[in-house]
Amino acid sequence: AMETGSFLVNEKSAVLPEVYLIGQEAKTLSEGLGRKIQLRVSIFGPLEHYLHEIGNTPYQDVLEGLAGTIQRFAKNSVLNNKYIETAVVSIDEPSFGFNNIQAPSDVICGVLEKTFDFKGAVRQIHLHSAAGVHDLLSVKNLDVLSFEYAASPKNIDAVSKSMLEGADKQIRVGIARTDIDSILAELYEKGVGKPSVDQLVEPKETIEKRYRVAKQKYGDRMTFTGPDCGLGGWPSQESAQLLLERTVKAVKLAQKN
């Protein structure tokens, strides 16, 4: 779209190839698993794209064009049939709170409201910083605020349960570290130059403790959890899989007890 001078992608072209492929293979995957597939889709948000393409100076038409484009990708990612259901669409804004577009909060909220103007799935925004979260509480169409907690424990200090209740929002908290470069550096300082898969992943007890702390704070407002984001850079699928498995086991153990 940008090659033609527009930041708004044609609706028929706004399809994530991964989602398309999963949709095509949904019947086979569902029958192999013995259950309906619950899909979570993550998409870089309009603010992140704007920072990469334009910078910090706001241009309303460009912001609205990018918001419309991401909305179309999100809408087309909502699948629902007997084999698959898109349970969550998460818009990822990792720079928000660190490197912001110099626009008034009402403009930013308007951009995000346009982005989240779709139905059929829980609508999340994923942030790496809690700075500026107050501005997002008024965003319509947004169901869940998602934060890094495992690698950035101070994030939950900035978000109270009463804030979420007042805005009728839910929260997702990351409870297992995924910042692999820092993990490797810490292990190296301890004399572990070539860590095993098991050494890369935090102990189940550590993950469970984080879950308990977050759940105690947010109660029924904490409707989602899992690892922090960023498994793409992990050294192997085996290590990433172990992290996911250990996180699930930690949560189930905490809920059981």
Regions found by a protein language model. Name each.
Residues A1-N257:
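Domain-level signal for soluble alpha/beta catalytic cores
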